[in-house]
Amino acid sequence: MATETRSQDGCWSCRLRKKKCDERRPICTECMCLGLECHGFGTRPAWMDRGARQKAQAAKMKQKLAQLTKNRRSKQARAQEDCAVKQPPNSHTEGPKVQTDVAAASNGMLIDHESCSLPQTFGGTSQDEFAKSQGAAGHEEEIQNTIVADPLVSSGDSGSPTMFDDMTFLNGYHVPLASSGNSGFQASLEEMDFLSEQNFDLPNLESILTGSMHMAPSTAVVGVADDDLCSEYLLPESQVCTAYPLNGTSSCMLPITDMEDAMLLAYYMEKVFNWQFPFCSTPASGLSQGCFLWLMSKSRPLYLASFALSSSHKSHQRALADPSSKLRYEDHAGRYDVAREEFHCNWKAPKAADEVSMLACIVSFITSSLIHGDKVDWTCQLRAGTSLIAPWVTQARPETNSSPLKSPEESSRDFFISSIIRIDILSAINQDSAPALSHNYKELFKSAHPKFSLEAVGGCHNWVFEALLDVYLLRDWKKKTRAAGLLSLWELTSKATTIQVDLEKKIASNVTLLRQSKEELEQQKGRPLQSDQCQYEIYVINHTFACAVSVLLEVIVSGAYPQLPEVKQKAGRALEALTDIKDARLLEVVGWPLFVVGCVVEEERQGFFRQLLSGQMRNSVSLGGLLDLLEECWQSRVSGEVKDDNFDFSHLRFHKSRNVLIM
């Protein structure tokens, strides 16, 4: 019996806890059901050392499980109290039955996802349904009894407690080369479900991966992850007692019920929107303030998620202006809870929810993690987002000049798909491997008329991200071959040279366009056209990101030696590009280059980053915490904790017990 619960080939979280893992990709069921971070199936984490760090990680995991259990029970109690208070006067005869149903559904919340679905009536629960919920509650209680045990100690076959034995080293997650086509994403897609209704086609996985499925422009196909994909989407117990109708996407007007909501809406449109989507004014953008407001009026989840983000952003700015005012997640937790509840209702709805609002909600939740990094798990949101965009990405067809104008829904959908693609690619810098959809992204970017344009989201052309994906894949190849003892320096250099030659050609071409654009602006004598100004800014962002990509490529090939001529030259060029940016609005979107270049510059050049991030950009929301991360990197290299020859940006994946988002 003991051997059935031991995991030698599962995710690292289950292996640490000695629990059986179903090895679901990209995240296993066990971790999602319990609300734990799944550390995946790649290379052995640094903390898995069979020593102090491993014990500390196990203790941290145990503490988190205990806290989750405590929070869940507190919510159950509050939910029952709220329901009792909110019952109408003529329902006193069915009161006990309502409370029983709430408790039963709550007890099964973390284990039986189907029990999360709201019944049509609460007073008519059958005995079979009640027994089922009680069974789920008993099963959940059994798991809780298991997880409170010390995760560092497990019972072997003999039943006696034993410490962790040696764990078989797992190779990194396989990222196929271009010749393998879409097969590399098989592991990530094989468990997906797809919602459907009258206006939605029901694709099968084989047709998606082989490219045989036809996607008409008027047909929306939404790929929805498995129920166990993300524990954050589990319906909270308080949902049963909500005072608002939970009909998913609504066609009604914005339900502004009080002055606070009206002020948050005004603040979002005035401050947050332009910060969140700084390049919406470009011709290629498919989103505007009016379009976003229209989307909010049709989608209650997006409306609530946007208000939660607006509330957090407003408090963040207030805390910066007034030292006595502190930014506390608890002050906004209620808004985020309700937003997630509504999001979950759309996610689990029998009708396919509006995919535009779902994508927009995910982008808003990920953006919120920049403010509440220790409370909002962006990795969970991103996994949900990539599962939603997978059918669109794998089946995307190049646009043609004769393509008809897109509807507002189509333009907005493409914009938010591009947003998730951008986040997925940039955030991989300090993760274990390249994005699972890397080869699909590359195919999109090669098109002369790509369906998804990333410049509309972050001001950076697709060719930069295509080069970055090549560098990521080279990094993964180097890790895999080195672990197998098969690394060929000649082959590594050859692959890197191919990438570098193509990248340098595009950098030179962009520099030419940058200079021409700058001359045109100067000829307009201080009153440039908005379109010309936007185009110039895009060339600036292109150059900055591309120079940072060249730095990353050099580090992968030669190591992170700041004094090495190749690294020094590439870092110096990137630093010059960063120095030329004076506009704080543009600096907000170059966090990724600041991180990459800042990690490998010489000691005498570190002052630029300290001065910028503690001076001009000290109040930045997007760059908050970046200086602390760089200081940690510099200190770890000075102390010898991290060696230059094996420097990997994944060393900086976690900071202050949170997974750092770089974008």
UniProtKB/Swiss-Prot annotation:
<keyword id="KW-0479">Metal-binding</keyword>
<comment type="function">
    <text>Transcription factor; part of the gene cluster that mediates the biosynthesis of the meroterpenoids arthripenoids.</text>
</comment>
<dbReference type="InterPro" id="IPR001138">
    <property type="entry name" value="Zn2Cys6_DnaBD"/>
</dbReference>
<keyword id="KW-0805">Transcription regulation</keyword>
<dbReference type="GO" id="GO:0005634">
    <property type="term" value="C:nucleus"/>
</dbReference>
<dbReference type="GO" id="GO:0045944">
    <property type="term" value="P:positive regulation of transcription by RNA polymerase II"/>
</dbReference>
<comment type="similarity">
    <text>Belongs to the TRI10 transcription regulator family.</text>
</comment>
<keyword id="KW-0862">Zinc</keyword>
<feature type="DNA-binding region" description="Zn(2)-C6 fungal-type">
    <location>
        <begin position="11"/>
        <end position="38"/>
    </location>
</feature>
<dbReference type="Pfam" id="PF11951">
    <property type="entry name" value="Fungal_trans_2"/>
</dbReference>
<dbReference type="GO" id="GO:0008270">
    <property type="term" value="F:zinc ion binding"/>
</dbReference>
<dbReference type="GO" id="GO:0000976">
    <property type="term" value="F:transcription cis-regulatory region binding"/>
</dbReference>
<dbReference type="InterPro" id="IPR021858">
    <property type="entry name" value="Fun_TF"/>
</dbReference>
<keyword id="KW-0539">Nucleus</keyword>
<dbReference type="Pfam" id="PF00172">
    <property type="entry name" value="Zn_clus"/>
</dbReference>
<keyword id="KW-0804">Transcription</keyword>
<keyword id="KW-0238">DNA-binding</keyword>
<dbReference type="InterPro" id="IPR036864">
    <property type="entry name" value="Zn2-C6_fun-type_DNA-bd_sf"/>
</dbReference>
<dbReference type="GO" id="GO:0000981">
    <property type="term" value="F:DNA-binding transcription factor activity, RNA polymerase II-specific"/>
</dbReference>
<feature type="region of interest" description="Disordered">
    <location>
        <begin position="71"/>
        <end position="97"/>
    </location>
</feature>
<protein>
    <recommendedName>
        <fullName>Transcription factor atnD</fullName>
    </recommendedName>
</protein>
